[in-house]
């Protein structure tokens, strides 16, 4: 079986050619995944957590330095089936949100694949990622959800694996691997191709941010190189809008060295240009396109001294960028600050699910909140 072997729940079952997805019979409907019994859980030692401790609550930050815009409002929706963080940043296809991999239930290499249906306010179980990992990069295009790289250990040991999930058949296939291992990269679709930007690579012991910029062609199953991101960084926010790619925020190696940098990639010239920086310097935030603006929410910052958080911040700020005026403004913050969230737009709402409730990976969240402008 070659690298395009079809994977159903992680098992190779048939050889696959470039157009074979459409030939596969459709599976039964995805099964409902019951909601988590508690909003949080611990990575170490296990166990659900119903309330944050005062010291954990103190990490929450809500105030933005940006000028005020329309408030908007947040609502609480069905929680994830279990508390999760450090998963793929989330992507949407056909009106549903897909959240893949990450930390959960005491492990950092989960293969979870949960799908949210806004019409029923239910989470569904989909075929798991063939190999569990955290900080996987994901993007959706032409009926498939693509997953690239990730870490096998806790924010360490990057991977080269790449997979495509066929939404119509609930099955994964192996596609051309990354040329170099990396996790916490950003994946975004532009003109039918998937750009994989930034992230962190080897060595395992001393994780290092990278500015690598590679482009995957789904038709040819091939990778090509493009101009590197200025300022190698990971845990960025990344979206494509109006023919350009925006890369905003992130970190240089660790959350102690976050940045507010904002660059756009101009594909026709294979070059990068600077734009107005993000008002709140952060990494591990969500970034989506909503009503012709770029909305950033969540994230983290701080210092870890021998594993103990110092100056820890978990952000609730919601800020939006107007590409026409190159300006930012603030909106109502997330009620539950989190980082490493899954964020996607479904209909006229921004959905933010899961994420870390405290600095680092100690506490996962099942919280699911949605934002809309009046």
Where are these regions (language model features)?
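N-terminal export signals
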Residues: 5-23
